[in-house]
Curated annotation (Swiss-Prot):
This is Undecaprenyl-diphosphatase. It comes from Shewanella frigidimarina (strain NCIMB 400). The gene is uppP. It is an enzyme of class 3 (hydrolase). InterPro entries: UppP. Bacitracin is thought to be involved in the inhibition of peptidoglycan synthesis by sequestering undecaprenyl diphosphate, thereby reducing the pool of lipid carrier available.
């Protein structure tokens, strides 16, 4: 891979992974516009690892507190709001794990194409707009309860369909269930950690058995660029989301979906 290609794709991954705008919709654009070949499994692992490092480091204090509270609850059988949140994150992860293990190949074969990505980008953009407009926005992530956590987890599993956007689907569900914008974003980011880690392990297993050569310099650059882009994206999204709302991202998704349809049929 050329250096420009590595930087551009890693930037796209880092900037779109945690925004509700679909990373898969953006990663398909270079191949459609520039005619680039698929970047390969090893590069996918690299840029996803960079994004995972970003969210873990950004929320390192919260993750440590939640982990300690969770382990303490196992020993003491007493629950705090932090241990409950940790349990809810685990619960919300289960649907995506089940769907990922049982339907990953089917989804990759039947849904990873430009038409599906364009349609889901538009449809789930409209759902995000409706959720943001109708949300009661009263609950924090510590107040939602296990049923709401499970429903958000089901939304995350649905986001395995390309173009849906994991963060977009989970924030949409959280807003519909009454969480504030800040709480919806924080819970979405925190619940991305176990799912991203599991996905990285799953893809790494496939990578080990792949005979394709590995460009370690490109992978290292991809990890660094993806990490920096994702970290800055998380920081500024959380800083401004309560003020700007979801409308800018909805409009962007509609435009992006229209562009993809145009590239497909024009």
């Amino acid at each position: 891979m050329e250096t420009f290609q590595v930087i551009l794709l890693a930037l796209i991954q880092g900037l779109t992974e945690f925004l509700p705008i679909s990373s898969s919709a953006h990663l398909i654009l270079p191949s459609q516009i520039l005619g680039w070949a698929d970047q390969g499994l090893s590069f996918d692992v690299a840029v996803n690892t960079g994004s995972l490092f970003a969210v873990v480091i950004y929320f390192r204090h919260e993750i440590v507190v939640l982990a300690k509270a969770w382990f303490t609850s196992l020993a003491s059988k007493q629950q705090t709001q932090e241990s409950k949140l940790a349990w809810w994150i685990i619960l919300a992860t289960i649907p995506a794990v089940i769907v990922g293990f049982t339907a990953k190949d089917f989804i990759e074969t039947h849904f990873r194409n430009t038409l599906v990505i364009a349609i889901t980008t538009i449809v789930f953009g409209l759902l995000l707009w409706a959720a943001d407009r109708m949300s009661k926005a009263q609950l924090t992530e510590f107040q939602m309860g296990w049923k709401k956590a499970l429903l958000i987890g089901l939304a995350q599993a649905m986001a395995l369909i390309p173009g849906t956007s994991r963060s977009g689907a989970t924030m949409t569900a959280a807003l519909m269930l009454g969480l504030t914008r800040d709480a919806a974003a924080r819970f979405s980011f925190l619940m991305s950690v176990p799912v991203s880690f599991g996905a990285a392990l799953l893809v790494t297993k496939d990578l080990v058995s792949s005979p394709a050569p590995i460009d370690y310099q490109a992978l290292g650059l991809g990890i660094v660029v993806s990490f920096v882009a994702a970290y800055l994206c998380i920081h500024f999204f959380l800083k401004f989301i309560s003020k700007i709302g979801m409308t800018p991202f909805v409009l962007y998704r509609l435009a992006l979906g229209a562009i993809l349809l145009g590239l497909l049929y024009l």
